[in-house]
């Protein structure tokens, strides 16, 4: 679920950045999404949106499903997740969080005018 996703993000970046920093970033981080991602970090969000979309096509509810994950020294990983939907959502969240941690955060892409820049 979205609360767990925020913890997974914090785990992946080792507490260097709040998950809230990603809630209104670029064209795809946060609610909705359209146009071309503004950078690699925004592309991570588009991939995550697409991953949730695939989960929904499989009959899953990614924004509400709970899953078991572990935050280790190498970052988050899904743990003992046997149900198909829960596993899919956990995999989506961990992949996105790791993608966030790998890519630079550009403050200029926070809270952008999506009507102008996301066409």
From Swiss-Prot:
Function: Snake venom phospholipase A2 (PLA2) that has several activities. It is myotoxic, has weak anticoagulant activity and inhibits neuromuscular transmission by blocking acetylcholine release from the nerve termini. PLA2 catalyzes the calcium-dependent hydrolysis of the 2-acyl groups in 3-sn-phosphoglycerides.
Enzyme Commission identifier(s): 3.1.1.4
Cross-referenced InterPro entries: PLipase_A2, PLipase_A2_Asp_AS, PLipase_A2_dom, PLipase_A2_dom_sf, PLipase_A2_His_AS
Subcellular location: Secreted
Lineage, top ranks: Eukaryota, Metazoa, Chordata, Craniata, Vertebrata
GO annotation, cellular component aspect: extracellular region
Cofactor(s) annotated in UniProt: Ca(2+)
Entry-linked Pfam families: Phospholip_A2_1 (PF00068)
Residues of the active site: 48, 93
Protein name: Basic phospholipase A2
Catalysed reaction, written as an equation: a 1,2-diacyl-sn-glycero-3-phosphocholine + H2O = a 1-acyl-sn-glycero-3-phosphocholine + a fatty acid + H(+)
Protein family (similarity comment): Belongs to the phospholipase A2 family. Group I subfamily. D49 sub-subfamily.
Binding locations of Ca(2+): 28, 30, 32, 49
Stored PROSITE patterns: PA2_ASP (PS00119), PA2_HIS (PS00118)
